[in-house]
Amino acid sequence: MKLAQRAREVLGEQNECSPADAELVLLGSWTDKGGLDPALAEKLPQLAGKRVFLFGTCGFGGSKEYYDRVLERFASELPADARVVGRFMCQGQMPQGVRRRYEAMEDSPRRQMMLDNFDRALGHPDQQDLDGLTAVLPSL
């Protein structure tokens, strides 16, 4: 939601229309098992032939390579003739239930790494993330 709001601020309020009627679609999603939010599936066919800017958040952060892989998976879910014209991904805060699930895991270095990452994700997207999105939007 923070990223979508920033996009509205940077690009200005546009007349809302269906994706089928838009020239450019900004498609934002949290990352679900490495892919787009499943709730978006029914809207994706409307993006055929459209220019699409992909953006989103994922719980694991800190690696551009990981973000790029996630964005590639996002793009692979679009219709074949949709044209990705830009991308942005940053870390996103996860629900407390995720932390509880990590806490219930057997004590291990992996468990600690996951807990540490969860704690780093708190408050994201943060100002630096929003500034990163702001930097790429004017090119649209």
Q: Where is each model-derived feature located?
A:
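Short amphipathic alpha-helix
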Residues: M1-L3
